[in-house]
């Protein structure tokens, strides 16, 4: 029997890309999905596909930059399923541009989604996980959380922050004996709508060229599944998943 069967899994950014792929993969293993994103029509479609395949999924339209909405999402999961076993903290954006272009609004948005959104989600699920003395928080960082490159300075900063948050949370929960696992997943180039969040034409042209080597989101979904499937005394803390031909 799969270690995933009947686990209650919240996925943010579930309407496309890695979030959508993870939802389908985990549902096929018997998880009960709580899907969160801003685009309701996408969530409805995904829920329908999962249920048509025999899986279980509910959804709630959620903006991760709102702490109140994240708390409501966790409360909804607890109301419907009675527990939260896994959080896949996936929502993120990737605007790229050189600093001198002063894309300040995009900096603010990245910080709100990629850092505050991650923190709000953790804060929303942590109390119930600590109370039940089990849980698994999976944060999506990036290869950009390990490297820095021109044009990606702020994005890299947010993804380095996700890695730091993941490791800090891991240490805190390990020393507290709560049996909460923390996994940081750092994808390389993956086919998704992430490129659409870059408005700067120069940066977008470079990204479009680089992303010709991108792998499918299913590859990351399988890695997430692998981490969840481990026995409760085993924690996969860090995974870097690149296309084989990706250099940096």
Across the structure, where does each feature detected by a protein language model lie?
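Substrate-binding pocket helix/loop in short-chain dehydrogenase/reductase
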Residues: 98-99, 106-111
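C-terminal helical subdomain
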Residues: 180, 184-185, 203-248
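Residue(s) in the substrate-gating loop at a strand-loop-helix junction
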Residues: 142
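Conserved glycine-rich cofactor-binding loop
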Residues: 8, 15-16
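Conserved glycine-rich Rossmann-like NAD(P)H-binding loop of the short-chain dehydrogenase/reductase
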Residues: 29-46
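Active-site helix of classical SDR
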Residues: 122, 158
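The beta1-alpha1 cofactor-binding region of Rossmann-like NAD(H)/NADP(H)-dependent oxidoreductases
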Residues: 40-41, 61-73, 104
């Amino acid at each position: 029997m799969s270690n995933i069967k009947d686990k209650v899994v919240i996925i943010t950014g579930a309407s496309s890309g890695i979030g959508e792929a993870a939802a389908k993969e985990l549902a096929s293993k018997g998880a009960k999905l709580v899907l969160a994103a801003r685009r309701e029509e996408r969530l409805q479609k995904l829920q329908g596909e999962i249920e048509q395949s025999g899986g279980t999924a509910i959804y709630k339209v959620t903006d991760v930059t709102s702490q109140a909405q994240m708390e409501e999402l966790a409360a909804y999961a607890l109301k419907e399923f009675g527990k939260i076993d896994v959080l896949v903290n996936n929502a993120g954006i990737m605007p790229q541009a050189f600093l001198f272009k002063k894309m300040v609004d995009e900096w603010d948005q990245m910080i709100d989604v990629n850092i505050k959104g991650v923190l709000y989600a953790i804060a929303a699920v942590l109390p119930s996980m600590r109370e039940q003395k089990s849980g698994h928080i999976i944060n999506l960082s990036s290869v950009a959380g390990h490297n820095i490159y021109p044009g990606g300075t702020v994005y890299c900063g947010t993804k380095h922050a996700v890695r730091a948050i993941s490791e800090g949370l891991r240490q805190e929960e390990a020393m507290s004996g709560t049996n909460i696992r923390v996994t940081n997943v750092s994808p390389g180039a993956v086919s998704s709508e992430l490129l659409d969040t870059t408005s700067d034409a120069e940066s977008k042209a470079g990204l479009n060229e680089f992303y010709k080597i991108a792998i499918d989101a299913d590859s990351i979904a399988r890695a997430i599944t692998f981490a969840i499937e481990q026995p409760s005394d085993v924690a996969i803390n860090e995974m870097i998943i690149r296309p084989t031909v990706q250099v940096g």
